[in-house]
């Protein structure tokens, strides 16, 4: 984001967890100055530490990725001079990033860091609850929270997702929480502690599975399938795997016509209900057809017929994948000292067509001079506790979103005080119909949206567009996950939005981005998982497997949240809004980065302790209960709903969980008074 949205923020990155490294990098990409504290170890000692800390959950497994875009400062707790320099640096910074569960509790280090106003601690279980402070790896957490139980095939065992998705997801939440805390620090002079737990992040990722549990049904694994659509699966062609999604009867008829004319009129498969009852038969027809074809022409054939699909891209192919290459999502740089070529991600946040910046990898201790040149931060007198406003008091947000990405970003903004108006089509959001229901409303819809107000608008009508334009003129944020180009076709391109409101922060989240090699291509979470390396990272006997949780959808929404918070801070300086372009494929590829520069991944890397918990087990776990991760709220008509608490815990300005979203209003509603 140019100028850097978080320019002026100084960050001291001390913790060794992968999530800490991810958080620091995201903040650096948004303009913060990040000093990463590196151990004064030999390379072999560093590698040994990376595999011994919490089962490989250490960022030092790849120094290039851990340090890119940051300033390196070497440190040894046994050296008094290093302790003194750490204290001096902390006094000059706004934020310190920690992972106290795996890095110990050296009293001298704690004393050295105490002058930093914002403490962000990323741990396995957080600071409260019966498991507080206990170390655990990514895969221990996947097993304990039900995430692992959702991944794998129906007739097989649960599988770990072959990537540290919960660590990386926690890093995104931590970065967003840090940006929110910095907003409060600059406004009110109040620092605070941020508590981000992998456990909480994982429970929050179960949005598609928790409703079934609360309806008294057991969640089950579906491999690469879909509980409500057939065919929807991964199939092996002559030259690679492909993911094909048929979401309705019309798409099935198009697919059947390609496979065999006789299949189109087969009454056994005529309706979705018929195909769900004969899942194996339908999959067999598709698999036999795909097996005789090559993947690239098959993708073209299916897309030409309007059938969502995607080749399953391997991780070693990602840098050359056409859309990732166009968006310059992966850069190749030389490692200092060795000269070895390594791959690193560029920024996930594309704003106002800014040029992509290739991050540099710092030589060891190359940031020490810059650290010495800093002056300590002057500390303001903090506001009285009673006068501290919620972070987004008075913020006005429009959301046009279905399913996960935009609703997730807007839900979290609402939890910190924003006034969110969700725009639904005149007939209502299609997710309202998703089973299971309570009082004729989808629990998935409720749990995904949280506390918002809803307005039904027909944006194809003159009256609907006029009402929307009026809302935009008074809004601070517009976040949407419509098919790229949809708003433009409705008469609201970038120029029109700027004319209506030059201060508007507009965030578009889509599968492949506004700038894309795949203009107009439909994208489901599963298709994006196929095309970003996630499915390649998790295989059973060579068969690629999607993560049970909607990793690409969730990540896209999280990055949208972070980008919006950062753009709001930039607006304070420039007075101007921003046009943000988030691609779920970029985010999904970013989640795989720890596999980019390694040639071998051993079974040890996904090892875990203890039994695999079900979604039901996880929802009732003592840690879930103690941290109140699932809370009950009553809607306007008296129905009680289980809802998710935020995984971002700020000590002075905590997020809230308000009453759930009700029915969409057909009468025009306006903004609340600031």
PLM regions with names:
Residues 1-187, 285, 366-579, 584, ...:
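N-terminal helix-loop segment corresponding to the beta1-alpha1 unit
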Residues 2, 333-391, 638-674:
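Flexible, small-/acidic-enriched active-site or ligand-binding loops
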Residues 181-223, 298, 311-317, 567-606, ...:
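Substrate-binding/catalytic subdomain of NAD(P)-dependent oxidoreductase enzymes
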Residues 64, 230-236, 446, 639:
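Short, surface-exposed beta-strand/loop micro-motifs that present aromatic residues
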